[in-house]
Amino acid sequence: MRCISILGSTGSIGRQTLDIVDNLNISVAALTAGTNVERMVQQCRKYRPALAVMATEEAAAQLQIEIGDIPTRINWGEEGLVEAATVAEADCVITAVVGMVGLKPTLAAIRAGKRIGLANKETLVCAGELVMAEAKHCGTEIIPVDSEHSAIYQCLMGNHSKEEIKRIILTCSGGPFYGMKKEQLQTVTKADALRHPNWKMGPKITIDCATLMNKGLEVIEAMRLYDLPLEQVDVVIHRQSIVHSMVEFTDGAVMAQMGSPDMRLPIQLAMTYPERKECPVDALDLLTCSSLTFAAPDMEAFPCLALARQCAKQGGTACPAMNGANEEAVALYLADKIGFYDIYDLVSKAVNAVPFIANPTLDEILEADKLAREAVRRVAKQ
C-alpha cells in the first residue's frame, strides 16, 4: 500500500490511524472531519493531503482561510466524503466516521475498488447485506478495524469454510458499569459512562459500550461480515480486554486472538494485510497479565444488548431503525437532555414506531433511519 484516505481523521480512530501512517511512512491522499477545524489544520499542514473535507460549509470555509497557503483542495458534506472515499491516489480507505454518514462513502469506495479498513460498524448494521453483496460483486476487500472483528478475521485467515465454524464468540469488557444492577444504573452520571476501563475511544462509542449497545451492533456486524445466523454469534464478558474474540470450530477447537488493548494493532493490520509490520504498541506480556476471566452478560441490567439481538433476528429495517434511534438517543444523552436508561426506552419505542420492511432497498433503509430519529426526538419531548 502506498497511499491512504482517512474518513474521520480528527476522531479517535482517525488520529490513531495517522500514528500508523507515521510508522509505515506512507502518504495521505485525503482527510475528512466533522467541525474540528483546528485539528484538521494541524493534520493538513503535517500530511499535505490532496483533499480535505469538513462536514459543514462553514467549517470548510474556515479551513480554507487557515490553510490557503498550501495546495490542499477543500470540499464539504456528503459530496466531499464520497470524493475522499474515491480519490484516485488512495489504495486504502479507512472509514472511521461515526454513524450512518459512513454508508454512502463506503459504497462509493467499494465501487472504486479501494481496500476498505472498516471502523464504521453502522454501515454493516444498517445495510450489511447490500454492502457485502456489492463488495463481492466488485471484488473489493473489506477488512474490519473493530478489535473484535479483526480478531475473528485473523482467526479465520486459514480460509476455513463456513461449515467448519460452530460459533463466533465476541468478547466484551462489560464497560464502566459491569456488575451493577438496574436500580444502581438509574443514578449513574455521564462522566461515569464516559470512563471506559480499557479503551480510549470517542464519546458516542464509549456510551454505546456503557449500555452494551456497542456489543449488540457488533453482533449484527459479525453476522454480516461472516454470513452467519444470530444463533452462531455469542457474547462473553472479558474484563481484561486481552482476548479480543474467539472462533469455536465444529471439532471443538477454539481459536482466539490476543493482544494489548490498543486500536493501532487492528488499524495497522487492515492497512498492511496480508503482511505484518512492526507496530508502535507495547507487546503483550503474558507473565504480567492478570488472570483471564469470562462471564455471561447481564441482559436484564443492560437491555440494549437484548434489543439488538432481537432486531438482528427480525432483520430488514429493524436494524437501521435501531441504529438511527440509538445515534439520536446517545446524542441527547451527551447533551444532558435524557438519562442513562432513557436511551434504551427511546430506542425500543422508536424501533416499534417504524414500519417494518423485510427486504428493504437502500432508500428504504435510509427512510427507516430517518423515521427512527424523528420518533426519538418526538418521544423525548413528551
Language model regions located:
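Catalytic, metal-anchored helix/loop core of enzyme active sites in primary metabolism
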Residues: 1-382
